[in-house]
């Protein structure tokens, strides 16, 4: 497994960003991005919190295989209390963003509070800071991604952002990364908008370590990929019809 061993905690109300160790006991017990982030969420918020209030939290999480060559190793999960149902929202997305966060040295980002103005979080390896996003507010996710890559002068920056639906707290608003990938379930984008959080731009150059036996890992990964390719659902159904076949 490949845990970086640390998370970012961002207080949008105060504008502070802090590093803290990943709870490894929880990481072992609640395996995977969805389970681990949900554990953090239920421990930190009141079950009756208004999803669009300042007291709700929203988490971007990776899992122990994120950033590796394992199948689905590029995925990440956004977890919060969702405005669409009032239940825990776990929305998953593919692309490069999840792996980039892991390669920057982080397993998870937890946002709490609410910013008084539009902001985005910039992460470059160990350096993370909140920046003004007033110039991005009102722009589409495609415009936002292009602008952040241009300002960073780096086409490999990966961006997870909201568009106008999220800004206006539409209850089914998505979070979009890599132009066409979306955490599209349960209105996680609306929670992002309620906090005046426009985007997270991340660039990682550290790679992914901590594999105990890389050679054996690659062998098993190739074996499992073959099984998935030969399965009617994962091998043919998903590429053709998407998640509606599940």
Predicted feature locations:
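Intrinsically disordered, low-complexity segments enriched in small residues
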Residues: 1-92, 99-246
